[in-house]
């Protein structure tokens, strides 16, 4: 249903889509497909996408820039790497890091594992772990 609504908006010639929780209520595969569709619309058709989402695990895979808002104010903004490397800003507004970033952050700070950076995706985490043990 959500894809049909988006198609209708695009058929009317909209160049900007404002979406509130476009992945809400979808299973993980549906969330991934929706975010992939929105990314393709942006990259291939030049459609500007502005969305509100709490799906932080998908953000690093699909978004170039994001802003964390609280009470109408921007708390932090930038690339996913810029935003998610400040977990204190996330917890202050009751958001969490992407799951893999949360795990690596805990390993780095609580278990003193020498990660150079906090990876945001499973692929990035794999590369960082291989670097540590290569």
Regions found by a protein language model. Give the residues of each.
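H-loop/switch region of ABC-family ATPase nucleotide-binding domains
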Residues: 53-54
